[in-house]
Swiss-Prot record:
PANTHER family: CHLOROPLAST 50S RIBOSOMAL PROTEIN L22-RELATED, LARGE RIBOSOMAL SUBUNIT PROTEIN UL22M. Signal peptide: none annotated. This protein binds specifically to 23S rRNA; its binding is stimulated by other ribosomal proteins, e.g. L4, L17, and L20. It is important during the early stages of 50S assembly. It makes multiple contacts with different domains of the 23S rRNA in the assembled 50S subunit and ribosome. The globular domain of the protein is located near the polypeptide exit tunnel on the outside of the subunit, while an extended beta-hairpin is found that lines the wall of the exit tunnel in the center of the 70S ribosome. It comes from Bacteroides thetaiotaomicron (strain ATCC 29148 / DSM 2079 / JCM 5827 / CCUG 10774 / NCTC 10582 / VPI-5482 / E50). Part of the 50S ribosomal subunit. The gene is rplV. Coiled coil: none annotated. HAMAP family: Ribosomal_uL22_B. This is Large ribosomal subunit protein uL22. One of its GO terms (molecular function) is structural constituent of ribosome.
Length: 136
């Protein structure tokens, strides 16, 4: 590995030490449905977000709730202490499209309609809310 590449890799590694996130990959739900749930909790305090997800009727809410609990646990492990109420916020959450399974459904006159079974990847970041984020 070259010197510049090594320095860049070390910087990325150091930056990851201050990021607290969790990833959920290959979720068999369409990204559009998952984004509805992600939009509900974006920017919320984590305890309030857990409450919103718990009482949401959407199927994806249970998966995002589990992901949020994982991100909180990651924060607690890196900081070696429990998170206090009002301390952590969902700073970033985004949903990306995953692999699509393509299936055929029989249709009239010998045709076949394509069914796309979509999946997605969810990435959730938690952290303390800074003054810069409040102004945006």
């Amino acid at each position: 590995m070259g010197a510049r590449k090594k320095i860049s890799a070390e910087k990325r590694k150091e930056a990851l030490k201050t990021m607290y996130f969790a990833k959920l990959q290959n979720v068999p739900t369409s990204p559009r449905k998952m984004r509805l749930v992600a939009d509900m909790i974006r920017g919320m305090e984590v305890n309030r977000a857990l409450g919103v997800l718990k009482f949401s009727s959407k199927e994806a809410a249970a998966r995002v709730e589990k992901l949020l609990r994982s991100a909180i646990a990651n924060w607690e492990q890196k900081n070696e202490r429990k998170a206090e109420s009002g301390e952590l916020f969902v700073t970033q959450i985004f949903v990306d499209g995953g692999a699509t399974l393509k299936r055929m459904r029989p249709a009239p006159q010998g045709r076949g309609y394509r069914i796309r079974k979509r999946s997605n990847h969810v990435t959730l970041f938690v952290g303390a809310k800074s003054n810069n984020e409040d102004q945006n």
